Amino acid sequence: MRIARRWVGAGLMVMGGLASPALAQNLFVVTATGNGNTVTVGGDSIIDLVDSAVNTQDQFAQFQDVNATFALNYGGIADAITITKNSGNTQASLTFGPTGTTRTFTGTSQDDLENQIEDYLKKQGGADFTAFLKAVNAQSVIAVSDGNPNATTARMAGWAFDRFGFSADQRKAYTLRPGAAPAPQGAQGGGDPDTGADAPVMERANAGFQLYVGASGQSYSAGDFDGESATIFGAADFNFSTRVGLSLGSFLAYNTVGDADVFHVGLTLGVPVRLVLPGEATPFTWQVTPFGQVGGSGSEDIGAGGLIIGGGITSYLAWHISDRWTLAMANQYTHYEGEKLSFSDFEIDPGVSQGVMKHGLRVSCRLTECWYAYAGASYSTFTDDASIDSWVSPAVGVGYGSIAGSGVQIGFIGDYGDDYSASGFRIAGNLVF
C-alpha cells in the first residue's frame, strides 16, 4: 500500500506527543502480520519507521500484496495504533487503542484509498487525534507535551515557580543606599557583631531595570530510558516602584531520550506585586505574581509537537528570622491548554488540558555580608491525569549578592517521582543597572 509520505509524516506529527519504552532499545516498534508471516521492527524515529511499514518498504516489502495488519507499540503502549489493509490495497481501517476509536476507509483504487485517508488526516481526524494524545500523555513517563517532570507543561510551570517563588530573592525589588532611616530587618547591611560598630543607616531605593540569565543541565531516567536535558533562560525586569514590577522571561530547552531529540520553548510575562516589605515591625516579605505564558515543543524523531498557552499565580512569603537566617515558602498554581496549529491544510493539537500545583520551602543563611548558602525542596503535582502525577525537587547551593542587588547562584537540583529521577546543576545571575 503505497501511501504518500507527505500524509504519513503530517499525520504522525499530529499523533505524536509522547515517547517511552517500547523495547529496551527502541522508542517505537511496528509488528506486521500477514500471509502467515510476522515481522517486528523497532526504531527511535516514528516517521521513518511507520513510513516504511504503511508503504510496505524495506523489511515490510513482503506485505505489499497480501492482507496485513500493522500494530504500533507507541511509547510502551501496545497496539496504540493498528492499521489493517486488504491485499488489493483498496480497504483499510485505523484504530486508536487508548481511545478505542476505529475509522474504516474503502476506495475504488489504491490512489482513491490514499486520498480518503489524507482527507481524514487533514479534516475530520483532528478530534480523534486530540483525544488519542490526551489518553497516551497520561500513560507515558516521557511524554513530550504533558504528564511528567520533563514535559513542556512542567517546564513552563517550573520556570515561573523558580523565577517568582523558589528563587524569588534573586530578583531585587529594591536596593539599599545611605539614608536617614534604619536598615530594614532582612535587608543586606547591618552592624558588625564582632566590633560592635553601629549599623549603617540605609533606605530603600527602586532597583529599576535588571537582567537575569542562567542555565541548567540534568541527566534523567524515565522508565527504561535515560536522557540528558539542557536549558538556558533569561529575563528582563523593571520595577515601577519598590512594590510593583514587570518581568518578561523565556527559556529554551533541549533534551534527548534514546536517540530522539526534543526541543521546548516558553515565554512568561509576570507582574510581581510586593504586598509586604520587611521593616522593624514586620520581618516579612510577601510577593504575589500573576503571570501569563505561551510555550511549545517539537520533535521530528518522535513526531511530537504543539503550542501550549496558560497562566497562573505565584505567592512568595519570606520570614527574615535574623540578619543571617531567612525561611521562605513559595506556592503556585498554573493551568495550561493546548492550542491548534495549522499548516499545509493540517491541524496539530497537543491534547493538553492540565493544571500544575507547586509548593516549596527554602532556608538561606548569610555566611558573610555578601555570601550565603541555601537549601530547600518543592513538591509538584498535576491536577489532571498524568503518567507521573507528583514529584519532589530538592535544591542546595551557594550564592553571592551585592548590596547593589547584582549576584549569582550555583547549586544542585533534582527531580524525583515514581519511575522518574533527574539530577544536575543550575547557575543563574542577576545584574541590576
PLM feature spans:
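Membrane-embedded beta-strands of outer-membrane beta-barrel proteins
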Residues: I232-G234, L267-V271, G311-S315, H359-L361, ...
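Short loop/turn motifs that connect adjacent beta-strands in outer-membrane beta-barrel proteins
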Residues: A199-G208, F238-L246, L275-W286, W319-L327, ...
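Outer membrane beta-barrel transmembrane domains
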Residues: F209, L246, E339-F433
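Transmembrane beta-strands of outer-membrane beta-barrel pores
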Residues: A215-S221, F238, S250-G258, V273-L275, ...
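Cleavable N-terminal export/targeting peptides
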Residues: M1-N206
